Amino acid sequence: MELEAVLKERTAAAGDPGRVLGAWVRRGWATAGPGVLESDGGSGGTLAFESTSSSRILELTSDNDPEYEALPEGSNVTAHMLAGAVAGVMEHCLMYPVDCVKTRMQSLQPDPAARYRNVMDALSKIVRTEGFWRPLRGLNVTATGAGPAHALYFACYEKLKKTLSDIIHPGGNCHVANGIDNSCPA
């Protein structure tokens, strides 16, 4: 049914791909539920949505919504470093067993009679045959190095993001500054 509608629009557009794409997007927004029709010019404060059941416009303001992408306003470099260190150590502690399994599966990958079918099978066989602590072997060294590395990275990222945001768009959050900051390794 969806294919028939697309083909019908293609023949009606007679070679104008912009019309086909525009009609397809409009139909997608209408069938998927409320879609974004307009915004207030990029300030991020107000968005207008149209309900599919009626033609009324609902206005939503996000001025009072909490921002989860940043630490509180008065945060200093120490808070950013602590947050980065904790996040980095936790990430390595959670992902280290998976990385251990990935390394083993990659070393056995070309063999059709490989010992492991999937990640969970590999992890259970490693724990059963070599002991519970085997997938965590070497984690202490990795976590010790991850703390300072992630602390420095996170603090540099936040400082550079704040500096670029103040230069490009004073008093607010600038997505261009965040993009530039993400492209520059610390």
Curated annotation (Swiss-Prot):
Protein name, per record: Mitoferrin-2B
Gene3D superfamilies: Mitochondrial carrier domain
Membrane-spanning ranges: 77-96, 137-157, 172-185
Coiled coil: none
A GO molecular-function descriptor: ferrous iron transmembrane transporter activity
Top-rank taxon, per record: Eukaryota
Membrane-related topology note: Multi-pass membrane protein
Function (record text): Mitochondrial iron transporter that mediates iron uptake. Probably required for heme synthesis of hemoproteins and Fe-S cluster assembly in non-erythroid cells.
